[in-house]
Regions:
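Mixed-charge, glycine-accented linear interaction segment located at domain edges/termini
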Residues: 151-183
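N-terminal strand-loop-strand beta-hairpin
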Residues: 1-128, 173-195
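Conserved, surface-exposed functional patches that form binding/active-site neighborhoods
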Residues: 112-150, 154
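A signal for specific C-terminal beta-sheet/loop modules enriched in small/flexible residues
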Residues: 89-98, 142-152, 163-166
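Intrinsically disordered, low-complexity acidic/polar segments
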Residues: 17, 67, 143, 153-157
Length: 195
């Protein structure tokens, strides 16, 4: 099922963000770590645009929570609006037993591992059940991600996007301008800049 979500970079200190969320009625629900390995058929991922690159990518994800690891292979089918913002996405996911063997298979098949992403996630929830995912991304900084819940399912994608954006901006944090941050692509762009 397609879901609308926003992801925006936050430039406040972690402690200030956590205090701001608590002040707005949010409490910590869970913590976990994601390790993502993105693979594509393109030999040089740096030459493609984001939509083409992601449409050709498979990712191997490891989720570490409470000293347990689960692994899966994911394909993200993202729908972009005319401005290149992600208006919705659908994830196709299958569990795998062994992250490293799966990575080795993809490499042996000639796929290019164009991005490795690690982020620590802290999920906050308010009394209505609305969740905010605070993400501490290695090499990039702090992000907030929020996705639609049952209360806005019947709205259009644009209305959902605007609702989520307004919800996040209401906290008063120092936010980036892009509410559709593409973290893997940001890492790729950072690699380009350093070369």
């Amino acid at each position: 099922m397609r879901k609308t979500e926003i992801t925006v970079q936050v430039f406040d200190k972690l402690l200030d963000i956590e205090k701001g969320l608590a002040k707005n009625g949010y409490h910590k629900k869970e913590e976990y770590c994601l390790r993502d390995h993105y693979f594509t058929k393109f030999e040089n991922a740096k030459i493609g645009d984001y939509k083409t690159l992601l449409a050709s990518s498979i990712l191997i994800r490891t989720i570490e929570e409470d000293e347990k690891c689960t692994h899966c292979m994911i394909y993200k089918n993202k729908k972009l609006d005319q401005n290149g913002n992600v208006s919705s996405e659908e994830k196709i996911r299958v569990k795998i037993d062994d992250e490293q063997n799966c990575i080795n298979i993809l490499r042996s098949a000639g796929l290019n591992n164009w991005c490795n992403l690690k982020n620590d996630n802290i999920v906050y929830v308010d009394k209505s059940g609305f969740e905010i995912d605070l993400q501490l991304v290695d090499g990039l900084g702090i992000f907030i991600e929020a996705e639609e819940d049952q209360s806005i399912r019947e709205l259009s994608e644009k209305q959902k996007f605007d609702y989520l954006k307004n919800k996040i901006t209401s906290f008063g944090f120092c936010l980036g301008k892009d509410y559709s941050c593409k973290k893997p692509y940001m890492i790729l762009q950072n690699k380009k800049t350093r070369q």
